[in-house]
Amino acid sequence: MTVLEIDLLDETKNLLDEDKQLVENILQFAAEYLKIEQGTELSLTFTTNEGIREINREYRDKDQATDVISFALEEMGDGETEIDWGEFDLETPRMLGDIIISTEKAEEQAKDYGHTKARELGFLAVHGLLHLLGYDHMEPDEEKVMFGLQKEVLDAYGLER
């Protein structure tokens, strides 16, 4: 069953179809596992270290490459007014936001951790999805919850270290 509508973009043009399919399969599995509403949408972009570095610099004031960045559309920013979508009779699907993954950073980390690039891409995709759902790891208690759920999803899928 397809729960998520995933708009996938490979800016690198180097990602294997099998890797893209694995990441989509893991995200679909995670969506079912986490009981995400059918038809929910997200975008997933694969980019280079330089591409993610530019995004990190522009939006997070960090001038360095990172592995994954998520932009949650349901997360309130400073000075934003919350909209109660329930008062509107809309048939629009839920849009979670954007996940951006550096394939180069995924390769580097896979080598460092001694597992496959595919495993690292799957890990980063689930990590990004959890951020879109509001999970974070800035505080130790948040980290314990998020990383525990991340491991639970990956283990249930069968993608272990």
From Swiss-Prot:
Gene Ontology cellular-component annotations: cytoplasm
InterPro entries, alphabetized: MetalPrtase_cat_dom_sf_prd, YbeY, YbeY_CS
Gene3D superfamilies assigned: Metalloproteases ('zincins'), catalytic domain
Coiled coil ranges: none
Keywords: Cytoplasm, Endonuclease, Hydrolase, Metal-binding, Nuclease, Ribosome biogenesis, rRNA processing, Zinc
Keyword Nuclease among UniProt keywords: yes
EC number: 3.1.-.-
GO molecular function: metalloendopeptidase activity; RNA endonuclease activity; zinc ion binding
Keyword Metal-binding: yes
Cofactor field: Zn(2+)
Main location per the UniProt record: cytoplasm
Binding site for Zn(2+): 127, 131, 137
Source taxon at top rank: Bacteria
Cofactor note: Binds 1 zinc ion.
Example of a GO biological process term: rRNA processing
Subcellular location: Cytoplasm
Function: Single strand-specific metallo-endoribonuclease involved in late-stage 70S ribosome quality control and in maturation of the 3' terminus of the 16S rRNA.
HAMAP family the UniProt entry points to: Endoribonucl_YbeY (MF_00009)
The family this protein is said to belong to: Belongs to the endoribonuclease YbeY family.
Name the record gives this protein: Endoribonuclease YbeY
Native species: Listeria monocytogenes serovar 1/2a (strain ATCC BAA-679 / EGD-e)
